[in-house]
């Protein structure tokens, strides 16, 4: 990573919202231009996904959401500074529970009355966003924006669900957080966003400030060739007259489509899953299901093996059954 990563030692974080496997990052990026519109490829990409194009800065955060599965939020640095009465710094940010007498006007133009069930992002203790759900209007990016603070975080899904329910809205970001995302990819997603910003603007090299460092070492899932064949069965070739198992090449191709890294083994493969899929690809059966989905469920033989082996009780289960029968008969 060509960017400096700085540990925020003094940042105040709500322990319920930022648990040990979560992360909060904030990066100051100067030299941007809020009036710059997005190129056609970027507009098309986000609008095809049902997201309205706003400007290049906002569109890039939404693009990273779609590409990496990591929500990002951009604050206008000058507006933050005006709000708190001094130049905003990374140490001014915090994550806490809202207070009962607080309110926040959000990006949708509505004023929300806050309470202790809602988690907020603050700058010098002033709420500037509802964490993981929606940003505040007062510090939003507009055509006059020249500097931003880029937030990339992973919050506890339970706190996001509570906040979303309390204010009665669900956003693209909150829906991702509620399902749970991996903090292993957060700094990578922020880095990707900064790389894209560098393609459009001349910006000083930013520092990525983070609440903690996440172990990004690959964890491997053992994927057995014979297990794939047993679970999925053979492929149907030539209108059911010919059948065969998936070849190693076909299996590897599908895993590479998922972005996995592979190590060949005698039994099959050790599979390292990319961070933004590490929440849903956890077990061997998860990988097998994805292979089947990418190949096409309808391409596999639907007929069960013949003869079908009936299930039977083990000797221990038989002994337990007999014991229970005698107990019921008062022996």
Label each region the model flagged.
Residues 1-321, 325-329:
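RNA/tRNA-interacting regions in translation and RNA-turnover enzymes
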């Amino acid at each position: 990573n060509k960017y400096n990563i700085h540990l925020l030692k003094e940042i105040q974080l709500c322990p319920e919202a930022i648990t040990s496997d979560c992360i909060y990052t904030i990066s100051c990026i100067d030299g941007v231009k809020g009036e710059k519109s997005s190129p056609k490829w970027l507009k098309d990409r986000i609008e095809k996904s049902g997201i309205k194009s706003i400007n290049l800065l906002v569109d890039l955060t939404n693009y990273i959401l779609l590409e990496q599965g990591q929500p990002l939020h951009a604050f206008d640095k000058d507006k933050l500074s005006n709000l708190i009465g001094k130049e905003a710094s990374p140490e001014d940010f915090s994550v806490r529970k809202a207070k009962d007498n607080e309110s926040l006007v959000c990006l949708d133009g509505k004023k929300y009355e806050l309470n202790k069930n809602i988690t907020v992002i603050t700058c010098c203790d002033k709420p500037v966003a509802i964490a993981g759900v929606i940003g505040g209007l007062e510090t939003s990016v507009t055509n006059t924006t020249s500097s931003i603070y880029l937030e990339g975080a992973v919050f506890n899904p339970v706190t996001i669900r509570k906040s979303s329910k309390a204010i009665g809205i669900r956003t693209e970001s909150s829906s991702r957080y509620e399902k749970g995302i991996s903090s292993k990819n957060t700094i990578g997603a922020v880095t990707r966003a900064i790389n894209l910003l560098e393609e459009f603007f001349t910006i000083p090299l930013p520092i990525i400030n983070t609440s903690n460092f996440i172990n990004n070492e690959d964890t491997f899932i053992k994927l057995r060739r014979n297990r794939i064949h047993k679970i999925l069965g053979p492929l149907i070739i030539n209108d059911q007259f010919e059948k065969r198992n998936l070849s190693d090449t076909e299996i590897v191709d599908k895993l590479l489509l998922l972005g996995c890294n592979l190590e060949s083994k005698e039994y099959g493969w050790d599979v390292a899953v990319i961070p933004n899929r590490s929440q849903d690809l956890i077990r061997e059966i998860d990988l097998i299901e994805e292979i089947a989905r990418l190949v096409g469920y309808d391409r596999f033989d639907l007929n069960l093996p013949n003869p079908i082996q009936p299930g039977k009780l083990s000797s221990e289960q038989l002994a337990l059954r007999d014991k229970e029968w005698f107990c019921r008969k008062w022996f």
